[in-house]
Amino acid sequence: MFLERVNQKTGEREWVVAQEDYDMAQELARSRFGDMILDFDRNDKFLEGLKTTIPEKKKENGDGLVHVLDIANITFPGTGTGLLSLMAAREGADKVTALEVFKPMGDCARHITGCSPWAEKITVISERSTDVSQIGGTAADIIVAEVFDTELIGEGALRTFKEALQRLAKPGCRVVPSSGNVYIVPVESHLLKMFNTIPRINGGEDEHPLGTCSGTASVFDVQLSELETHEFRELAEPIVAFKFDFENEEKIIYNESFVREAIAHTSGTIDAIMMWWDIDMDGKGETFIDMAPRWKNPKHYAWRDHWMQAVYYLPDKKCVEKAQKFEIICNHDEFSIWFSDVGKDSTRSYCVCGLHSMLSRQTVYHINEMFEDQSFRAEVDRLSSGLNVVTVGEGSFVGLLAAKTAKTVTIIEPNERFRDIFHKYVLYYNMKNVHIVEKVTHLIEKPDIVIAEPFYMSAMNPWNHLRFLYDVEILKMLHGDDLKVEPHLGTLKAIPECFEDLHKIAADVNTVNGFDLSYFDRISTKARAATDAIVDEQSLWEYAGTVKGEPVELLTFPVDGRILSRKCVGKMDNMQSSNGIPIWMEWQFGDLTLSTGLLSTSESRKPCWNKGYKQGVYFPITNLQNESSINLNALFDKSSGDITFQFKKFDVQSGN
């Protein structure tokens, strides 16, 4: 078996051979299914749908027998834990056929359902519904399926329902959920705009260094509940973009476009379109799963991370005036949704500048935020003034900022596509003092200073940017130890935090809706305990919480050209009131401290996290969850360029 890994010293993706005893349960443990199973609002409403449809079908069928088909996709463990199948059997289904394509989850479902009082009723098949031609004799009377994602249809819900109704179900088959609605709200928001706009060095609306590319139409999934209300303005009331009938195969159409009308209740520019959906669980319009953000539906809001809200961008700038009627074209194909303006091309837009297709939304935001950060720009100006500057990184725009005051700037950029993008910026802004080379070894003359953010596009977490140390090592070998480098120091930090909800992604599920799912916990916990501690990467600004102490310094990295393996044992206190440990890097850049994580803390201990980076976060495994203090062991291995973590009980007697 081959697994893909990133070489943290070079950024290259490599295939490694897994050991013969590699346990796929480790992948299950890393996949973070916990919050899906602990989504009690969703569980209860699926249950309500089954409570409605099973008695109806028993009454309709002459023999009083009901066959339920439970369909899961690879991203959701509805079948994987057997939860929906168990619900159906307990509510009176005479036969339940469960489909689960992900083998570890299918095995888990077989064990859980096999140990239940309804074992004889439930059959688990490890195949996709679209690959199954028959399900054991009788066709299904009811389909219960959790095949949704942030876009509602992105995991193949339309084809799943259409083909299941055609091939695996009886005429008149009920579906739980029966239908879905997609809602959109056009908003003005400088913040959301920063996740899509091509970075402009001077911030002018008339600057087009990469042409007039509108970006990609792909979904930007985000926890909109964590946006502050002052960070956007709704320009109209929610619009119903699409209505999907999951019970009528003839009405399930893969490609559709609709013109939807709205009235602006305030003037502004449509910088973004917010989207969410709801689904009707009983077919009566009485029980809904509603994905509206907290500020839109505070009374019935339910947090979840397996589904989020979404943001889209129109291909062209559109302004509206108060009381003006305006129209938006709403489009979808089998898997995706996009929006366009009336009178313009409504086909799905794609990035033509190369920037959006290479970078995550988060990185586009990071570059825009860096360009707007006047303190950072002033420090770059000061450090670069009149000097021959070299910048290192992968996809780092800092060299373009240094050009303002530097005598010369040499951007070392290993990525060919980024070299092309930087050449376009250099030509557009007439930066005659900027040169671009591929490798550190291509630098012939000794520079006065090396500058970096540091930023490497291939980095998955903040400490992956330590690749910077290896670039500096080569530069100092070539040009001498006296070569000045900024930043001159990096620090790995951590802090205990009590998250309102995020910890649920790694929480034990135990008993859910009266069903014992603890076997799922056993295989997940065993797998997590058998590996190095699993530190997730999360955009922590999207998740509410309060910090329970001060940052703890774990490892320091002097940027002096000498790379040494390092280790530490840090004590994390206040863990009895915490459920997670965020981890990030800080860099001393001249007179500034640049944080990839915690930026500030409010009086109420609410943290402000850097939106331009993902942070690491560790969720204590079961045997550490009741400890008041735990030890955090961090080891940086110079041979791999990576950091591994271990978390252990704090030994009071030994003090470690």
Curated annotation (Swiss-Prot):
Q: What is its EC number?
A: 2.1.1.-
Enzyme class comes to transferase
Q: Which GO terms describe its molecular function?
A: histone methyltransferase activity; protein-arginine N-methyltransferase activity
InterPro entries attached to this UniProt entry: Arg_MeTrfase (IPR025799), MeTrfase_PRMT7 (IPR014644), PRMT_dom (IPR055135), SAM-dependent_MTases_sf (IPR029063)
Which segments cross the bilayer? none
CDD domains reported in the protein's UniProt record: AdoMet_MTases
Q: Which UniProt keywords apply?
A: Methyltransferase, Repeat, S-adenosyl-L-methionine, Transferase
Q: Which GO terms describe its biological process?
A: chromatin remodeling; methylation; regulation of DNA-templated transcription
Q: What start-end ranges are recorded for coiled-coil regions in this protein?
A: none
Q: Which residues form the SAM-dependent MTase PRMT-type domain?
A: 12-338, 343-656
Q: Which family does it belong to?
A: Belongs to the class I-like SAM-binding methyltransferase superfamily. Protein arginine N-methyltransferase family. PRMT7 subfamily.
Tell me the function of this protein. Arginine methyltransferase that can both catalyze the formation of omega-N monomethylarginine (MMA) and symmetrical dimethylarginine (sDMA).
Give the protein name, as stated in the record: Protein arginine N-methyltransferase 7
Instruction: Name the lineage.
Output: Eukaryota, Metazoa, Ecdysozoa, Nematoda, Chromadorea
